[in-house]
Structure formats: structure tokens, C-alpha cells
């Protein structure tokens, strides 16, 4: 279940799994952690974008997740793409840095994370698409079809920034 309250910008994603996303919701719980995360826009040679359907909130997304101790940003990005999709990529650019304190994700263990994600561009190297415990579907999607996919606004913003071919990374 998800949606916006009529006439408002509040966005809340509720799923039958362990995560609730809040965006611009005054009733959202207060963040108690910030976890550095990466997300990656990986286009193929036809400019289609690699998307996954997340198992934790059922929404479509670009691959990504939290960094692990000892990892560089590049290593975390490559690992997340490979783990969630089966695709190998090389990191070639920066879309932006996203740190909206009005976007939090509440987990059933009591953790409430404030968004902090570095969104990168990945060049497809190889591999075959496959699902994982974090992705129930994996596919390359033409940019013209992306508006028809249920994507959280924070992820849609990143995809749009990539598609705009911005000359400077987004910082916000």
C-alpha cells in the first residue's frame, strides 16, 4: 500500500515486509541513524535503465544499498549491482548526492534511517540478469516506459537527474 494524501506532498510506502518509507510526512518517526549508501544507474547500449523490483517495499528502483566497513564507494556500488542483479559494471560518473532529512526509512527492528545516498553511473560490463533476496524482478527499461513504473519519488528524482544529462552532479 502506498500513496500520497490528497492535496499534499506526503509520500508513505507501507509493505508487508520490514520497511516503511516516509517522505515529507510530519507523522514520520525521527531518524536514529544515517547509513552511507550507494545507488547506481546502469544503462545498456540501447540507453535502457537497469531496474529492480525491491523485495522490502515492492517498488521499482535502481540497484543500491548500504556500504560495508572497509569498502570504497566504487566497491560498494559494484557489489550492490552484482548482488541485486547479476550484472557487472564499472563506475564511470556521479549523478548526485542525496541527503533529504525529510525522507526516512523505518525498519521493523526499530532502526529509522535518514536518507544519505551517493548515486553513480555504471557502465555495463557483462553478466546476466537474475533476481536475489533483495530483488524479485530485474530488467532493463526504456526511459520512455519509466513513468509507468511504481518508483519511490526519491529514486525517480535520481533517474530523472541522470536522464537530464546534467553537467554538474546534484547535491541536496
Q: Where is each model-derived feature located?
A:
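Conserved Nudix-box catalytic region and its N-terminal flanking loop in Nudix hydrolases
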Residues: 44-87
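Acidic, metal-coordinating catalytic segment for phosphate/diphosphate chemistry
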Residues: 6-39, 110
Amino acid at each position: 500500500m502506498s500513496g500520497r494524501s490528497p492535496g499534499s506532498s506526503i509520500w508513505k510506502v507501507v509493505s508487508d515486509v520490514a520497511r516503511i518509507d516516509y517522505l515529507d510526512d510530519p507523522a514520520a518517526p525521527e531518524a536514529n541513524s544515517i547509513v552511507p549508501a550507494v545507488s547506481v544507474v546502469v544503462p545498456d547500449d540501447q540507453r535502457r535503465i537497469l531496474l529492480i523490483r525491491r523485495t522490502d517495499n515492492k517498488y521499482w528502483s535502481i540497484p543500491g544499498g548500504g556500504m560495508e566497513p572497509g569498502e570504497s564507494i566504487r566497491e560498494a556500488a559494484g557489489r550492490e549491482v552484482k548482488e541485486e542483479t547479476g550484472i557487472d559494471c564499472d563506475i564511470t560518473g556521479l549523478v548526485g548526492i542525496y541527503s533529504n532529512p525529510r525522507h526516512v526509512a523505518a525498519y521493523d527492528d526499530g532502526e529509522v534511517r535518514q536518507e544519505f545516498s551517493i548515486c553513480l553511473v555504471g557502465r555495463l560490463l557483462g553478466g546476466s540478469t537474475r533476481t536475489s533476496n533483495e530483488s524479485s524482478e530485474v530488467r532493463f527499461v526504456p526511459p520512455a516506459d519509466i513513468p509507468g513504473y511504481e518508483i519511490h519519488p526519491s529514486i525517480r528524482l535520481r533517474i530523472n537527474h541522470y536522464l537530464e544529462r546534467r553537467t554538474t552532479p546534484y547535491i541536496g
